[in-house]
Amino acid sequence: MVAYLPLGITCGSSFANLNRMEALYRTMTSLCARREYCCADIAEKLRKKGASQEQTAVLIDRLIEEGYIDEGRYARAFVHDKILYNGWGRVKVAQHLRAKGVCPAYIQEAMPCITEEQYAEAFQKVLRSKQRSIKGDTDYEVRQKLARSLIARGFEPSYVFDNMNLDYVEE
């Protein structure tokens, strides 16, 4: 198929491919301008839009070069939001970042962006919320259920047992 351009210039499928790339680029910059994305998220969105692996690689490189994608910035935002707003622990956050293919160095760098006070506050919020809904016959049973629930939310087992006070368990 031949496309006709103004001034009598003709061009083959490479012109259509160029327009497609530019349209995909504009779509991805619009998405990245609204919130943080990692490379894996953008690659998945491009795959769903029908982009080839080569096009995906070129577009992701361009987005990184122009500052639309920054894995370190993404990791910091992810850690902040998941701990403070979703009540996740460090273990679960790190696991999800690894699953998205974020570099371990960025994960390590992002973890300290949450202070110990903020982390303790998030832990206590989840603890209070869960203790209202967990039922058991004995204090021991309630504490075990509570501990399992907190560990499943991604809080470190040692942190859970060190910071879970009997004062929070009501009969």
Where do the PLM segments sit?
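An alpha-helical, amphipathic repeat domain used for nucleic-acid recognition
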Residues: 3-171
